[in-house]
């Protein structure tokens, strides 16, 4: 049962990361000033 909980936790983390990547892409496309520096770094991370 403990292993199942770790699997669920792992899936939740992956989904959160994917959603975060989507938010980043939207913000970068909007060219929000605050995100411009983060977007530069984000381009080097292969999502």
Swiss-Prot record:
Q: Name one GO cellular component term.
A: plasma membrane
Quaternary structure and interacting proteins, as annotated: May form homooligomers. Probably interacts with the periplasmic domain of PhoQ.
The gene name reads mgrB
Q: Report if keyword Transmembrane is assigned.
A: yes
* Described purpose of this protein according to its UniProt entry: PhoP-regulated transcription is redox-sensitive, being activated when the periplasm becomes more reducing. MgrB acts between DsbA/DsbB and PhoP/PhoQ in this pathway. Represses PhoP/PhoQ signaling, possibly by binding to the periplasmic domain of PhoQ, altering its activity and that of downstream effector PhoP.
Provide this UniProt record's keywords sorted from A to Z: Cell inner membrane, Cell membrane, Membrane, Transmembrane, Transmembrane helix
Localisation per UniProt entry: Cell inner membrane
Q: Where are the transmembrane segments?
A: 6-26
Give the record's membrane topology.
Single-pass membrane protein
Q: What is this protein called?
A: PhoP/PhoQ regulator MgrB
Q: Name one GO biological process term.
A: negative regulation of phosphorelay signal transduction system
Record keyword rRNA processing present: no
Which protein family is named in the record? Belongs to the MgrB family.
């Amino acid at each position: 049962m403990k292993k199942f909980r770790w699997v669920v936790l792992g899936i939740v983390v992956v989904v959160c990361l994917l959603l975060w990547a989507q938010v980043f892409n939207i913000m970068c496309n909007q060219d929000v000033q605050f995100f411009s520096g983060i977007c530069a770094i984000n381009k080097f991370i292969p999502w």
